[in-house]
């Protein structure tokens, strides 16, 4: 069963990369029946975000934070979602930005550093938008 979950995740992620978001979600939701890997939740959320359903994306990313609260990645995904022009939520962005920048990672990595750098760049855009308002 575990191998099947891994296969379904890889297949669903491949469909995501091919921009087949609805089909990817169907496969990934099947994978959820066999695995509690939070990355499944993250990819489902990213699919919804790509389809323009930001509320569903938010729900799936939040579920991922609940599954493994120590992971920084879903907070990063939420911060980016809250920075989307069509879903802009500065207060929620600030909260997620703080999580990304201050949460102590289990392992320091290039990925963590890159996420933090990107969030800082997004923050600069928010500062400019606030000045223009």
Question: What would you call each of these model-derived segments?
Answer:
Residues 29-33, 62-66, 98-102:
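Conserved structural position within tetratricopeptide repeats
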Residues 2, 35-36, 69, 105:
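Short coil turns that delineate tetratricopeptide repeat
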Residues 24, 57, 92-93:
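Single-residue signature of alpha-solenoid repeat helices
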Residues 6-10, 39-43, 73-77, 109-114:
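Alpha-solenoid helical repeat scaffolds
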């Amino acid at each position: 069963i575990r191998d099947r979950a891994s296969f379904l995740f890889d297949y669903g992620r491949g469909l995501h990369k091919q921009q087949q978001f609805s089909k990817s979600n169907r496969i990934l939701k099947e994978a959820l029946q066999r695995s509690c890997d939070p990355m499944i939740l993250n990819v489902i959320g990213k699919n919804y975000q790509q389809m323009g359903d930001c509320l569903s994306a938010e729900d799936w990313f939040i579920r991922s934070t609940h599954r493994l609260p120590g992971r920084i990645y879903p907070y990063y995904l939420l911060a980016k979602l809250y920075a989307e022009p069509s879903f802009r939520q500065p207060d929620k962005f600030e909260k997620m930005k703080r999580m990304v920048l201050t949460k102590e990672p289990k392992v320091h990595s290039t990925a963590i550093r890159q996420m933090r750098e990107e969030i800082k760049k997004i923050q600069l855009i928010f500062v400019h938008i606030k000045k223009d308002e």
